[in-house]
């Protein structure tokens, strides 16, 4: 067990355990396609896209990319905050079974069916488990740089992320009314995380005031200091243990037969030989595209990964839809373009 730290002092910060909730309502943004220049090209609302972020990300992390994907595929894209992220409530547990169930409940609540999933890192594992456990809900998926196996080798990364964020909360004492609060927080994290892209992504959830009507059972947003929207103290062990884990026993006999595109960073440690074997076992209808990147594919290769996704989803749509539902006349099926940087 990790030692519990008290944020600043007990009078300033609430100190309780996270409440236990089997499911939780997820905050979301809906990105609709821009009107197309092709007058008769229909949107595809029956097969919406759900974009699930990585650890300590949010629905706002790749909003611009989601808008591009929505317009390029003529399909609405939902970006959601997973529990303990962004504007979604704080609760335990934080294991993959619970996160996948949250996605299922979101789809039920919004009457979504035959969804197409995009998952990055943490969101990739959530997407894979959602497809395996609820195959009738999911039509296809794009999995960005992760595999359905336990990954103890990445625990060190998680510990560094947590250490840097706790340093901002416990040691830096940055006031919420400081005009330079975000830059000061980034500078404080630099000693633990020299990579500016990683710091930028972690700072997405750092605020000097909470979103409207947002409340947390464990964070006192009125104490005059900046805060992460993540309950960092309570997530310390969960982020290291649960995020790097995978429910091996409950998924050992599960397969998802739908098409799945895997995007792999050539310099990333996340998809090992063991991970490749697990992918072949659980997702037999898989297709891989390698990109010249480490795990930070979405930041290092933004145009490439967006094109891979849109080509993949558009190929499925044109192959499965009758010609007269696409353009009102016969339209040749476009060739898929693989992008590898």
Curated annotation (Swiss-Prot):
Query: Which PANTHER family does the annotation name?
Result: PROTEIN ABHD11
Q: Which Pfam families match?
A: Abhydrolase_1
Q: Which GO terms describe its cellular component?
A: mitochondrion
Q: Per the record's keyword annotation, is Transit peptide included, yes or no?
A: yes
The answer to whether keyword Signal applies is no
> Function of this protein?
Probable alcohol acetyltransferase that uses acetyl-CoA to synthesize acetate esters from various alcohols. Not involved in the synthesis of ethyl acetate.
Protein name as annotated: Probable alcohol acetyltransferase
Task: Please state what class of enzyme this protein is.
Answer: transferase
Q: Which residues form the AB hydrolase-1 domain?
A: 48-301
UniProt KW keywords = Hydrolase, Mitochondrion, Transferase, Transit peptide
Domain of life, per UniProt, equals Eukaryota
E.C. number: 2.3.1.-
Database matches in Gene3D superfamilies: alpha/beta hydrolase
Identify the coding gene. EAT2
Transit peptide per record: 1-40
UniProt similarity note: Belongs to the AB hydrolase superfamily.
